[in-house]
Amino acid sequence: MAVQANQSASFGFRTASPSQKLSSKPIAHISLSTKLKPSSRPSLSCSTWNQGQIPARHSCINPGIFAYPPSNLTFSHELPESESPPLGKKKMRVLVKPLEKPKVVLKFVWMQKDIGVALDHMIPGFGTIPLSPYYFWPRKDAWEELKTLLESKPWISELHRVFLLNQATDIINLWQSSGGDLS
């Protein structure tokens, strides 16, 4: 039996201009909800209304990209009357982000006479930790040095080693075919 958790967060905001008096009700309401299910994606729904109008609801699948709001917005923690909880009971809402696993990434420095290749351990919420210095091609055999380093790390899977070495090969080949020029 599968268990689904439904978390959502709500935010209201009001627009204000010098000639406009703020009302006690928000003019727009944004609700972000996610279902913790492997195949689902977070969803965003936005309601906008004027006093005396029925809210128009818009939704989109991917809320990852937001435009910056105009500078004349005032944020409010009030909920519209239809969504406010009864007195004495407060609804608590939590937004849960899925956990990302740490991963090993390939970094490179593209120069005119050399290309540098290095490995970093990327830890979500913390940053990156360098696993190797930059190995430069064609001064030394950067691919062989990278392979030796990857083999010395038993916690990196064989499949991921092959993937990283293939990426390094592709980058070195691209650098060689372009003669070091990006243009």
UniProtKB/Swiss-Prot annotation:
Coiled coil ranges: none
Superkingdom of origin organism: Eukaryota
Entries under InterPro entries matching the protein: PSRP-3/Ycf65_sf, Ribosomal_PSRP3/Ycf65
Localization per record: Plastid, Chloroplast
An MF annotation (GO) of this entry: structural constituent of ribosome
One Pfam family linked to the record: PSRP-3_Ycf65
Alphabetic keyword roster: Chloroplast, Plastid, Ribonucleoprotein, Ribosomal protein, Transit peptide
Gene Ontology cellular component list: chloroplast; plastid; ribonucleoprotein complex; ribosome
Principal subcellular localization: plastid
Record GO biological process: translation
SUBUNIT field: Part of the 30S ribosomal subunit.
Functional note: Component of the chloroplast ribosome (chloro-ribosome), a dedicated translation machinery responsible for the synthesis of chloroplast genome-encoded proteins, including proteins of the transcription and translation machinery and components of the photosynthetic apparatus.
Stated family: Belongs to the chloroplast-specific ribosomal protein cS23 family.
Name of protein: Small ribosomal subunit protein cS23y
Taxonomic lineage: Eukaryota, Viridiplantae, Streptophyta, Embryophyta, Tracheophyta
